[in-house]
Curated annotation (Swiss-Prot):
Location of the region described as Disordered in the Swiss-Prot/TrEMBL record: 619-648, 792-818, 858-879, 903-947, 959-986
Transmembrane segments: none
Keywords, alphabetical: Phosphoprotein
Name of the protein: FHIP family protein CG3558
Polar residues composition bias: residue spans: 628-637, 800-818, 903-925, 959-968
A Pfam family it matches: KELAA
Taxon lineage: Eukaryota, Metazoa, Ecdysozoa, Arthropoda, Hexapoda
Amino acid sequence: MWLRQSSGGGVASVGHVGPLRQRPIDAATDCDPRACYDSFCKHWQQAFEIIQHSAPPSHDDVLGVVSHLDYMVTLLLVELHHCNKVSLPAAEASGPPAAPCLEFLLSENLLDKLYEWACTTGRYANAVRLEQLKLYELLVSHSRHQLLCHEPFLRPLLKILASSQGEIFPPDLEKRLVILLNQLCVVLMQNVHLLDLFFFSAQTQVQEQILNGNVAPPKSGTTTNFIIFSLLIPYVHREGSLGHQARDALLLCMALSQKNSNIGTYIAQYSSICPLLVTGLGGLYSRLPNSIEISSIDWHRITPDDVTEIPELTLFMNALEFCNAVVQVAHEMIKQQLLDFMYQGFIVPVLGPAILQTNIDSQISAMSYLDLILRSITEPGLLRAFVRFLLDTEKFDGERILDALVERLNSPDANLCMVTMALFDTLLGLHCEDLMLELLLKFMLPGKHVPISHRHKINKIDPYLNSSEFFLELSPDVMKRARDLARPKSVHEPVVSELTPLPSLPSPVMSKTIGANWNYYGVHTGDSLYANIQAYLFEAHWRIAQCQKDCLKWANSYRYQKWPRHGQGRVHAHALELARQFFSEFGGGPIAANETGEKQLDSLQSIGESSGYESFKWRPADEESEATDTTVATTASEADMDHNSSSLSSVLGASGKRESWRTSNSNRNELILTDLDFSEDLFAQGTVSLGPFLNAIWGKLQTFTSNSLYVNLHLTGLITRLAWYPLPLIHSLLLRSDIAITSDTPSFHQVLRILKQQIDAELPVTEDSLEIIDVARSSLIDREFRLANARKGNEGSPMHHSQQQQMVTNSGQQQGQLRSAYATLSAATPVQATPTSAYDPFKRSDNKRRSISKSITSMFSRKSASTSTAPPNGSSASSGLSQIYAFFTGAASNLVGNNASNDGRGISQAQTSAGTCETSLSTQPPAGASRTGANATSTAASGSNSSIAGSTLTLSAQSNTTTHSASTLHGLDGGPSTGGFNSEPASLDSVASMGIIASTSGTERSRDLALCAVLMDEWLKELAAIAQEQSVVLVTEQGSL
């Protein structure tokens, strides 16, 4: 090689250097350092001769200098790689320098001379600047921070950076500049002590250049400048890799402001970054589509696939996520300034008018964008700004955004209604105290929705278990019958007497396996998740724990608590006086009767169930021992509310007086008067309002059987979201069937009873009804697995499909022999579950589901049409059922599977349900959530049967495009919609349109009721599980007190 053979006196020709530049850097470490140094010096000598020409440089001159610089860069690269470590300048002159070329570069001020010459190149300045930036980029990347300490390197670097301000460069030059700035930010982040070099030295350098006439004074009128940050600002909204690198470097600068207050002060007071970010965000929002093209009947929110497919939305989300990151890492001054600009310059003037538009399409798009924003941002400061925006009463002529959103829950437009409920699902998922107070708690804190005689029950735990039984009993009769028929009837399975089935169901044949095959209420589940409440218990446990963790951070505690023993004050005295006057009018009959020493009932005349009140009782001793002392609704930090709200003084008492009441009859009259406040709500006649939000939800629930399937999915999910809150006040409305409610609308439990009666009346337990129920359930299961495997099917090859079908067929041959005719029909859907399937019943919104092992594939699969076991008599199934069977085993993919191949976006939009907000684009629930004793739960959930696999989980789970639906009932189809906003469910309509279920004698109304029955049945199981888990939470809380 020429480098090793050279004597050092000559300079190789250009043709000899080329091969060295092309050699891998690892092969160049055996070079001769002396030869490299001589060649480096010779190239500089030739370049310097061109630079010293007095005449303006010509094209050839510039090309010659650039060529020599290129070779010098290559030699520096070889030397730096050979040295591995730079130590300059040499502290001791005892030996040769470790990097002689670099030593020569610095000692001879080559960089400064090169910069001075570049200023005279005129129209060739950009080409020379590009080579300079390459040189600096190389040196910074290989020497890290060592060279920044040396003035021969730092001074020309600051000069070239200062001269780049305000300039417009070609793309290749911009790229090199941003890369260099990014590298400098990384070095400064690792060596904060060097930060002042670029802050103050840059200031001095700018002043010098102003004096020399090379640079114009800054427009801001100040020479204070953080040169790196200033150069990065113009690229903050750029697209592509250039914009990403610039934003990354700016974030490093923001993080540096936390370590250096001078940087924070400069960015907040002298830079324009905050106004630029906000105005850019508003401009990008204005470019978003004003009307979103809805391609599926169940579309309700923007998904990650939508973001990637819409360029304008991608740019907007990049800017929003950058603002979120700035608030997270920047100095407090910068953070506060950006939040103020965001609220005054984007949230109020841009989002406000967009949401308050009157056009329905515009409302849908604006609310979808707001929902996407709330799911994307994570910084509490930004979330507080958006909550303030929702509750602001001054910016929009006295109209609150939150009230406008609540009104849209009543919209007859199904798409607007679903988008609104999805938005409220996100809002409730924030677990924000202010929002919950405005939506629910401020209407419930007075306690007027609960009669006085029932308020002592609110903190009791036992009724929660009774509520679980209550919810299970509300299941429609046809669902109970279908569930009973679906149980395997095997004479080889002995009866287990320890588990008692529900009274409303026939005694099933018990299985030897306890745990995975049985739920907590004695309902046999076999290898299916159908009727397996354990899966709901697991989900409820995790959701409630997450909600409880967030609610513990609230400023107030919205629950019924013990009244303090002392200091009732004027409210106590006033209540006592009013009560005495009341009882004096009625005489002392019932009260005087207490002199006998026996516990008797105190009744109030003409106050009965019609007003929502029960007669006042002297509770037995055993009940008092279990109940909490007389309670009131209070907050932890609102003492004024305790004295100003008459409703909060409705029940007054103390634990010490409770004991006296129990032991001394002579004090009982006075103590009863002390505990009751009849000032306002004694004669309330059921006119208490629960607020517009709950009234809208109850109104939608009352039309449950008339709503579309997808509206009901979101509705049930929203109510489930409320039930997750560990607040007894909310439980008194949703989970406590033993507490009467006095409101101007039917209570939640009354509506559920009405719905059960309506379904039972219109869908009686007949053969036709059972067939329609089976079709509804099977179609929902079929579409869930179709959605879960849509992407996998698109990506798979014919070999993949062949192996998948073979696996399903083989696994189907291993089961199904012991199933009844109805069970076999229910299982007719060919579940496409493979070892790569993403179905995980325990995670509702995790956007990367785990695969299922081959060992449980058989639990999901069914026989194909050709291998299915026919009924013994060969004709027990009707011709209509045979057609249904053929439809779900063969024709289903042709009928509804075209959506996957035609529109990937539709598929991504389709994987949705109605209950959580953890489908943020970035945050996901932990995968390892578990509870004590949940081994059987996980076993039961993993071994799910396709006949009901998805219908027992995630009834109210919200999923995005990267998730696979975990619920049959909530895996909403995303195919093209042909029925408009109020079209009926696509799967059943498709079946009916082909005449496949004509023989079932089912009308369109009965099919709708069948869907409602299946959905309601599974939702009630979920509510039962939540009630049981909430009782566990209360026991834990009381045990820790």
